[in-house]
Amino acid sequence: MSYCRQEGKDKIIFVTKEDHETPSSAELIADDPNDPYEDQGLILPNGDINWNCPCLGGMASGPCGEQFKSAFSCFHYSQEEIKGSDCLDQFRGMQECMQKYPDLYPQEDDEEEAEKEKQNKEAEPSVTQSSDTKEESSS
């Protein structure tokens, strides 16, 4: 016999094997585009930027969040023929802020160099002889 249990915001439904064998009669409910908690993607239906989109990777809420929002908004709403060409000051401001926090915003060059150094260290032979061993082998 199937039954349902509510735990906080979650509804847990226990079903039997027979329940699984019969076709579902559940009706799907259309998503509410005005639901503020519903993931809408980067651009909301009204054309605004969804600063809570996980696709931004938290950039809008970090220590340089305001600079990021300024630069990204400028680019998004840019009407220039070369989109974003009117946003250089905002992007420079964002870059200057990010350079103050290299641990949070590593530059691609820094990441590539660190990876190359790591690979070089792993590839180097780590065999060293002590001076005692060298003397014994030469006698």
Curated annotation (Swiss-Prot):
Its main location: mitochondrion. It comes from the Eukaryota. A motif (Cx9C motif 1) lies at residues 64-74. Disulfide bonds join C53-C55, C64-C97, C74-C87. A motif (Cx9C motif 2) lies at residues 87-97. Residues 115-124 have a biased composition (Basic and acidic residues). GO terms for molecular function: protein-disulfide reductase activity. Pfam families: CHCH. Residues 103-139 are annotated as: Disordered. It is found in: Mitochondrion intermembrane space. GO terms for cellular component: mitochondrial intermembrane space. One of its GO terms (biological process) is protein import into mitochondrial intermembrane space. Monomer. Can form homooligomers. Central component of a redox-sensitive mitochondrial intermembrane space import machinery which is required for the biogenesis of respiratory chain complexes. Functions as chaperone and catalyzes the formation of disulfide bonds in substrate proteins, such as COX17 or MICU1. Required for the import and folding of small cysteine-containing proteins (small Tim) in the mitochondrial intermembrane space (IMS). Precursor proteins to be imported into the IMS are translocated in their reduced form into the mitochondria. This is Mitochondrial intermembrane space import and assembly protein 40-A. The lineage of its organism: Eukaryota, Metazoa, Chordata, Craniata, Vertebrata.
